[in-house]
Amino acid sequence: MTARIICVGNRYATSDDFGPRVYDCLAAMSIPADVDVLDGGLGGLDLLRHLEDGRRVVFVDAVSGFTHQDGIILLSAAEVANQCVSGFDHVAGLPYLLKLMPAVLDSPPPPVTVIGHEGVASVQTVNAAARLALRLATEDAADAC
């Protein structure tokens, strides 16, 4: 089984480019063989296929309403899924995916942690988030949140 770090967001929108920037940072690092790092981009529900057999999943995404500017926050899948207030549409994003996850996976959902950031992240914050994602992906704990 492999752990996965899935960085999501829109690299062309500064309010949503946290995940892609962390992905770029991780791509320049030495990653253990049992950790997959994916640029989830705006993959939406297509990302469900990466949750089927992962030992652990760490999502990295921009968030809103959770923390102060330039702060990193750790959230559980349930905390993010609870932000889904409507059905599926163009802006449903990660909350909808995590809300739907338990209902559509053939196997039990993997442990999921979301590394979130609000606002435009500094280079230092992006680097810290990349290191945190790697640490969370390789630890044995059931859930960091």
PLM regions and their residue ranges:
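N-terminal catalytic or cofactor-binding beta/alpha core of small enzyme domains
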Residues: 1-145
